[in-house]
């Protein structure tokens, strides 16, 4: 649905851009239930549930400044089909396999539930895998207006591996990510949003280097 909009692109991480610029706000029925972490919606909401998508240029997020100060912010608002609005939408996935190279069981599973209306919304999501699929963007704020997100510093930094392969071929992980979002909106001036998220990510990495020297005979 989004890719069909003129000027809209969606990159490999799920970030929505309009005319090359990341959107600053992502709304569903005028509400931002995920606080900019809209992959939790995009990855789980069926296209059939979306009635229309609207791009709003020069969107002013500060109500007191509307009509007084110009803004270069861009907002996206999804309007749902009346049959899907306020209804609980649930999805579940489960897949398993066996890796002969590592002699281990591989899995990928997910369970999510969404309830998106005009006055209250909920998004709950759990995903896990150990097959190399990166789930880090599930908790990442993707909107361009992300000043409120404070980067966390880790105790250890993992070196990157450069190779002409897809990322899932290089990632040996065991990841569990869980998040919950609940929002109430009484009017344009009063709303309440509750959010919680947790990610447990174990990444293993092995590196090797072989050098071969040839000498003329």
What are these regions, as identified by a protein language model?
Residues 1-217:
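Membrane-proximal, glycine/serine-rich, low-complexity loop/turn segments characteristic
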